[in-house]
Structure formats: C-alpha cells, structure tokens
Design a protein with these regions (language model features):
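Charged, glycine-rich active-site and insertion segments that engage polyanionic ligands
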Residues: 1-56, 60, 64, 78, ...
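Conserved strand-to-helix beginnings and helix N-cap segments that scaffold or border functional pockets
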Residues: 150-154, 284
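Clamp-loader machinery-focused feature within the broader ASCE/P-loop NTPase space
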Residues: 1-151, 325
C-alpha cells in the first residue's frame, strides 16, 4: 500500500481514518457493497468522499497500489475538477438525489422542498434499471438520506433489498438515527469523525494547493479558521469557496450583539429581513448558518462565565466575550443557548420552514436575556 500522502491525494482527508482504511480494503478486494451509508456530522466531508468513491468506480486509470481514483482522467474530472471546484458533477452514470431533485411527475415542483418524496424515489427506481451509458457501473448518491419521507423510505427499501446489477447506492446522513433500522441494516456504514487539528491543517494546505485557493497568511486568522471548522474539512471547502469565513463570523457576532441590545420592534424587523421570505431551501440554509454562529457566540459567553475561557472558540473576540459575558446572568445565558440549539434543531429536521421559520425566529429573539446595566 502507498504512503498516507498518496492515499490522501486519492481518498481525501479521511484516508487515514478507520472509515478510509475500510474503504480502501473494499476496493483492493473488490468487495464493494451495493449500498453504503456514509454517516457523520454536517460538514465533515461525506459528499466529498462519496464523489471519490464514484470516481474510483468509474475511473479510466485507477491507482494500482491503493485502488483509488486517478483524479485526472476524463471520468474523474467530470465528477470533480480542481480547476472548477464549485462545478456540480456532470456524469451520465452518476445521479445525485437531494431535496429539490427531479421526480417522476412532470407537474411537481420540488425546488423549495425540505424532504425527498416518494415521487423522487419512483424516478430513481427507473434510473436504476437503465444500463450504464458510459461506464460499467452506475452510482446513485442520496444526500441527505434522512430527508426521505416515510413513504419514500419504504419504496426505496424494496430497491435496496433487490439492487439492480451494476448499480451502487451511497447514502449520506448527519442524522442516521432518523433512518429506519431496516434501511441501515441493508447498508455498510462508514462513519466519519472530525479530524484532529494537525491532520486538518495538512489536508487544508494540500487542498488549497490543488485548487489554487489562497489561505489567510495571518497566523491568528489561520488558527481561528481551523477552530471554526471543528475538524470538518467539508465545512472548510464550502465556506472558503464562498469567501472569508473568519470575517463573516465576525459580522455575524456583530449582528448577535446588536440584536441583543435592540428593542422588541427592531428585533422583529430584523427577523422579517432574515426569515420573512425563507420559503426556499437556500434561505433556510442561510438562517441555519446564522443560528450556528449565534450558538457558538453564546456558548463562548457561557464558557467565560463558568471559568472555562481556555475553551472559547472565538479567541480573536476575547475582549468582547469578557465584557459581554459580565452583562448576563449565567443561568440566563445557559437557557438561551439551549433555546438557540432547539430552534436550530427544529429547522434542521425540516419541521419549520417559510412563515413557520419566521415564527420560530421571532420567539427566539423575544427571549434574548436582558443585559445588566453596565457600570
């Protein structure tokens, strides 16, 4: 087997993990199951690994040493091209099913859907029966699999129980407990965990060199970036492509402080701007990112209050954390942090969307703790 650097080039940031070693062994022995479940936290790199698996299956020149994809042939580049990292995969034999995917009914519009319904699975059942067009196998990725409705899951189970030849399914889930036990039992599970900081940093340097992305040169900014990632390479990929996540987080903290000091009317006006028109998946995702930032900020305040300042996330904001934490009662801070996390969880499960997302945000904002008068 090749060294870990070569494995990392082929299989990505999780190559040295238990999941990565298991995956390499599957390809080396040519015993890849027809259904894989890749589980792990949001942003840990599940989609990246799924695409690497698809590359390995469709690759024109697979690595003879570690059975990985070459990453440079036509098939590999159509699934991931470092020169165009934001381009969606374009391969006739790879289907990515997600919330908002096409379905079997021409008059259905799923663009704002937060679930994967049975009509989408009906279309996938048909796609699975088709002979691969360009490659020898067909790969169907379902992301996130926990978005399957009950009816869709039941229908999909039948396909898993009798998978068509030369068709492989890869299910991705950050909440695998929401998948039925029967579906999970039909899949081989690979669990991805957050990476240690040193491994994450090594991967980040390699990925930046591959994509031509410029990383922060300031050591403090770089350290804060790695802390914000919490060991999640997928989070870094998504956020660095979109801009400067450290500056964005600073702006989100500014908003959190401003809204905490705002009047009731000002809070509701801000909620209208953020969630009043959150009727599509992208708007809901943006709201979730804001709540993630708020959760991190209020957690830092709580850590400061409980003499755990060494564990705060936003080290560059230490002075603001110290000053702000002194304005709130510790119990109130803890209670509000729980409220943020409950609101975030509701939206994550798709229970609240559209006007209901606005209502959830209203309730949250109206329960921000009252600060003490500063001396």
């Amino acid at each position: 087997m090749s060294d870990s650097t070569s494995l990392g080039d082929r299989w990505g940031p999780h190559a040295d993990s238990q999941a990565g070693r298991t995956l390499v062994a599957m390809f080396e022995t040519q015993r890849l199951p027809h259904a894989l479940l890749i589980a792990g936290p949001v942003g840990v790199g599940k989609r990246d690994l799924a695409l690497r698996i698809a590359q390995a299956m469709l690759c024109d020149s697979p690595d003879e040493v570690n059975a990985g994809p070459c990453r440079t042939c036509r098939n590999c580049l159509r699934l991931h091209n470092p020169a165009q990292p934001t381009l969606d995969p374009q391969h006739t034999d790879v289907e990515i099913v997600s919330m908002g995917s096409l379905c079997a009914e021409s008059d259905h519009d799923h663009r704002n859907s937060r679930t994967i319904g049975i009509c989408v699975i009906r279309r996938i059942e048909h796609v699975a029966t088709l002979t691969p067009f360009e490659a020898s196998e067909r790969v169907i990725i379902i992301n996130p699999a926990d978005a399957l409705t009950a009816d869709a899951a039941d229908a999909f189970l039948k396909t898993l129980e009798e998978p068509p030849e030369r068709v492989y399914f890869i299910l991705l889930s950050a909440q695998q407990e929401q998948l039925s036990e029967t579906i999970r039992s039909r899949c081989r599970t690979l669990t991805l965990a957050p990476l240690p900081v040193d491994r994450l940093e090594r991967w980040l340097d390699r990925w930046a060199a591959e994509t031509g992305l410029e990383l922060p040169s300031d050591a403090q900014q770089r350290a804060e970036l790695l802390r914000l990632a919490r060991g999640r390479p997928g989070w870094l990929q998504d956020n660095l492509r979109d801009g400067d996540p450290v500056s964005l987080r600073a702006a989100q903290i500014d908003d959190a402080i401003r809204i905490a000091n705002a009047t009731r009317a000002e809070r509701l006006e801000w909620a209208e701007q953020i969630a009043g028109r959150s009727t599509n998946a992208q708007s809901i995702d943006n709201l979730q990112l804001i709540l993630d930032a708020w959760s991190d900020w209020w957690r830092d305040l709580w850590l400061q209050q409980t003499n755990q300042a060494q564990s705060i996330l936003h080290v560059s904001q230490r002075e603001r954390i110290e000053g702000t934490a002194a304005l709130y009662d510790q119990g109130a801070t803890s209670h509000f942090l729980e409220r943020i996390q409950r609101t975030r969880a509701l939206i994550e499960r798709g229970i609240t969307h559209g006007l209901n997302a606005r209502l959830a945000l209203d309730v949250l904002l109206l329960n921000i703790p009252t600060a003490r008068e500063s001396s």
